[in-house]
Amino acid sequence: MFCPFCRHPDSRVVDSRTSDDGLSIRRRRQCPECGRRFSTTETASLSVIKRNGVVEPFSREKIVTGVRKACQGRPVTDTDLAVLAQRVEEAIRATGASQIEANDIGLSILPPLRELDEVAYLRFASVYQGFDSLDDFESAIAQLRVAHAATPDADAL
């Protein structure tokens, strides 16, 4: 790795530690030429294949932005959205794939969003899964009610 100060083509790793809840590695490096220290961050690249075939880098912020619309007017904080986006990214990275289709990201969002807020879940699912009629909503609500009945301390819908 080139030193950002003197452009020497080598550096020595002084310290390494995980950051971003284990999704990246932060390394402190020292240049053997000028002796100055600098930090680098390493992450495994993850790309998204969009519906039109375009490939772009994965962005947690896009998840937050998309889910925020479904959560408008709901008791969901920015911290809740950040945690949800992190959970989605962790689930995607756990697959071991370096590329993922946008559709699969949407499917990965649904379970943690359902746990976070069921109304936001219905809003997101209605757009994402293309609900066309009241029957689609009724079916989704019926599934939520069945899940509530199976959970002893669940709130009623």
UniProtKB/Swiss-Prot annotation:
Which note does the record give on the cofactor? Answer: Binds 1 zinc ion.
Family according to the record: Belongs to the NrdR family.
Protein species of origin: Clavibacter michiganensis subsp. michiganensis (strain NCPPB 382)
Q: Where are the zinc fingers (unnamed)?
A: 3-34
UniProt keyword terms in alphabetical order: ATP-binding, DNA-binding, Metal-binding, Nucleotide-binding, Repressor, Transcription, Transcription regulation, Zinc, Zinc-finger
The record's annotation in PROSITE patterns points to: ATP_CONE (PS51161)
Question: Which PANTHER family is this protein grouped with?
Answer: TRANSCRIPTIONAL REPRESSOR NRDR
What does this gene product do? Negatively regulates transcription of bacterial ribonucleotide reductase nrd genes and operons by binding to NrdR-boxes.
Which NCBIfam families does the record match to this protein? transcriptional regulator NrdR
| GO terms assigned for molecular function | ATP binding; DNA binding; zinc ion binding
User: Which named protein is this?
Assistant: Transcriptional repressor NrdR
